[in-house]
Amino acid sequence: MGKGAGGTRLLGAPKPKSHAYFTSERKRLGTLDNNIDYYNWKTGGFVIWQEGHKHANEGRKNDEFRFAKELARHGYGVYLLPEDAKNGGISFRLSAKGGSTFSDAKVGTYYYEQTTKKSDNAKYGVLSALQHAGDKGIKLAAIYDKYGSLSRLSIQKGIDWYEHNRGKKGSGLIKLDGVLVVNKNHELYWHDMRTSENEWWEKK
């Protein structure tokens, strides 16, 4: 496992030369959609953050957020799930192929629905958001849990449910590359759906 200016990185990922590695590619969407904090126009990867959240400012400065941007640079869609998101949801829009402005190629609005039970949240809320976006051809490949609001066990239940139902007629589930979980101890857990292997990264 390597370390670069962008924080902990995935195995096999190229090492960034400087922090400009992210900032030079960053294009803030501003008021066009406040829920998307980072979008990489080259790869289509993105990081979703709930604006106005009490941890927003500190969240953008930590190693986990840099890790999320590293994933986005490689074309992953990454959710930042705030610990105080109890009701309602996170809505977001994405351009199918990018463009000079956000509204050039909108493909729809999708919702992450927060439920009261963590296991149900992992099983139905997050994965339903993935499948709805997948139906529109958007690549979503990772779930990013900033403050450990979803336990490793509940995520595993969601993975088990996903694997059990994937490929079933009418399920509508997309091919998911992997699931990323960050717990309160800043431990990074990546479940590779392609190899069914689990690996841990720890903040140094």
Regions found by a protein language model. Give the residues of each.
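Metal-dependent nuclease catalytic core centered on acidic motifs
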Residues: G6-G88, K117-K204
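Conserved catalytic cores of phosphodiester-cleaving nucleases, focusing on short active-site segments
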Residues: L94, S103-T116
